[in-house]
Amino acid sequence: MEIVGCRAEENTCPFRPPAMLFHGISGGHIQGIMEEMERRSKTESRLAKGGQMNGRETNMPPMSPEKPALCAGCGGKISDRYYLLAVDKQWHLRCLKCCECKLALESELTCFAKDGSIYCKEDYYRRFSVQRCARCHLGISASEMVMRARESVYHLSCFTCTTCNKTLTTGDHFGMKDNLVYCRAHFESLLQGEYPPQLSYTELAAKSGGLALPYFNGTGTVQKGRPRKRKSPALGVDIVNYNSGCNENEADHMDRDQQPYPPSQKTKRMATSFKHHQLRTMKSYFAINHNPDAKDLKQLAQKTGLTKRVLQVWFQNARAKFRRNLLRQENGGVDKADGTSLPAPPSADSGALTPPGTATTLTDLTNPTITVVTSVTSNLDSHEPGSPSQTTLTNLF
């Protein structure tokens, strides 16, 4: 689309020499000079117009008085000095408009034609775009940023929770069911309302046709399971693993029992993988407090990104391992399972005890610049890093 110059009057010359004072020149010479200047100006103007028309002859043939151009919009003759050339047709400046929104396209950089109709960029992509948003079902332009979930594509503003309309950004956990997007909280509520609470993650997968309803955070979810015999079935806790992409050789695993369904089947224990910074944070806090309360669990959940239930189960298992280790030390310091000798329990004067009520600083290992001050109660012992009891605790994990 371009603006092309049309006709110009050739019978008049716009150049008029200014009044000048000629000294020592007769009147006849002055008249000859003025006629020569006027002739040269006419020649230059004709050459300039001829060059301009020849430069655009590939786009539009020069107009002639015998065959005036017709506007493709209104069908009238074009007698204006300037007109528009779009899709190999001539248009009045006022006639080139979008057929949908009637937007004037004379100042736009682009316009689109489809089946003889003219569209602006927004209406063309809205009506004829190949990819459409899975939420609003409108077209998505090629230069627009999108969010992808499985095979669906969404506008950034349309990638929201179906229940609460919360905008989901990169890194947020979300769930999908029936091609609908849910935030983490409402997806958990949806699962709890649809399936009985005693069903484990394995039974949920079987009930859903072999494919469970996991959470998504941009990468695949890593989960491991192994059969294990138990003397008596116990009601277990099924926790969805939110930590994806973990290397099983570089991570610790937490085993959880599951209730069998139906009762004739063997029980299975699922394993949750932890990342290094999560383990360091939990172990550091376990050295200070073996039984954190709800407030401490909330702070740890914010640091590690784990749920409070996951943290509760981990601390419960850690306390059980710690008690078993103390019993083994009291029975002779030899582990009957593998025959390895364990360090002896520390003496009363082996480490310096922290006075009651002393504030102990716990550094967030995930972000070294953040420091959390926790008050240690009088019934807990805080040992120095070099004490034997600290070495014993490290060997547990």
Swiss-Prot record:
Where does the LIM zinc-binding domain start and stop, copy by copy? 69-130, 131-193
Name the GO terms of the biological process aspect. Answer: dorsal spinal cord interneuron anterior axon guidance; negative regulation of DNA-templated transcription; neuron differentiation; regulation of transcription by RNA polymerase II; spinal cord motor neuron differentiation
Asked whether the keyword DNA-binding is assigned, the reply is: yes
Q: Which Pfam families match?
A: Homeodomain, LIM
Which residue intervals make up region (Disordered)?
40-60, 330-363, 378-397
Where composition is biased (Polar residues), the residues are 387-397
Composition bias (Low complexity) maps to: 353-363
Q: Which InterPro entries match?
A: HD, Homeobox_CS, Homeodomain-like_sf, LIM_Homeobox_TF, Znf_LIM
Principal location listed in the UniProt entry: nucleus
What keywords is this UniProt entry annotated with? DNA-binding, Homeobox, LIM domain, Metal-binding, Nucleus, Repeat, Zinc
Write down the DNA-binding region ranges: 267-326
Presence of keyword Acetylation: no
Cellular component aspect of the GO annotation: nucleus
Where does the UniProt annotation place the signal sequence?
Answer: none
Q: Which domain of life is it from?
A: Eukaryota
Describe the function of this protein: May be involved in gonadal development.
Q: Which PANTHER family match?
A: LIM/HOMEOBOX PROTEIN LHX, LIM_HOMEOBOX PROTEIN LHX9
What's the name of the protein? Answer: LIM/homeobox protein Lhx9
Organism, by scientific name, is Gallus gallus (Chicken)
